[in-house]
């Protein structure tokens, strides 16, 4: 979900650590996707890739939650023309995968069928199947939302 619910100090720690990781790997220009876990306020990078984010992070979530043209920036970076600018959040976006682990979110999936905040819905039926990988969760369907706040069972 974007934006992440993080304190300003934690967000800054992540920015500094991510910059340090990219510099250490020699990634100076272009796309980069970093995944991290925060455990007991410690940062653990679990994936770093010189590519855009998957699971609709780049093509849908970032484009809809910020005033940042992700694809223009990617092209400009590849051509050596990218100029840094501040990015502002303009909405909340998120993706919920329709799998057994998310069966408690059934009210969200039901409401998404007719809600204006649902910008993509690939859920085919009400069966919540077990998912052991991204492929299985994508195959079982998902919804993507864009709204003034994070969509939860409590605010639909």
Predicted regions and their residues:
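Internal nucleotide-binding/catalytic subdomain
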Residues: 1-43
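Glycine-rich beta-alpha junction loops
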Residues: 4, 38, 49-52, 99-102
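Short, structured loop/turn "capping" segments at alpha-beta junctions
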Residues: 28-30, 69, 83-88
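Short coil/turn motifs at secondary-structure junctions
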Residues: 41, 53-55, 148
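Pre-DFG segment of protein kinase catalytic domains
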Residues: 45-47
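Glycine-rich phosphate/pyrophosphate-binding beta-alpha loops
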Residues: 49-65, 123-129
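C-terminal catalytic subdomain
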Residues: 62-75
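Peripheral (often C-terminal) accessory segments that flank ATP-dependent C-N-forming ligase machineries
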Residues: 75-156
């Amino acid at each position: 979900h974007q934006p992440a619910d993080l304190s300003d100090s934690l967000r800054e720690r992540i920015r500094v650590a991510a910059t340090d990781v990219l510099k250490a790997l020699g990634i100076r220009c272009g796309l980069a996707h970093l995944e991290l876990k925060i455990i007991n306020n410690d940062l653990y990078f679990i994936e770093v890739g010189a590519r855009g984010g998957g699971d609709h992070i780049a093509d849908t979530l970032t484009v809809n939650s910020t005033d940042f043209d992700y694809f223009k920036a990617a092209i400009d970076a590849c051509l050596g023309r990218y100029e840094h600018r501040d990015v502002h959040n303009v909405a909340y976006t998120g993706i919920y995968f329709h799998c057994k682990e998310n069966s408690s979110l059934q009210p969200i999936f039901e409401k998404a069928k007719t809600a204006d905040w649902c910008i993509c819905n690939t859920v085919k039926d009400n069966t919540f199947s077990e998912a052991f990988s991204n492929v299985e969760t994508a195959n079982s369907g998902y919804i993507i939302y864009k709204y003034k706040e994070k969509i939860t069972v409590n605010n639909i």
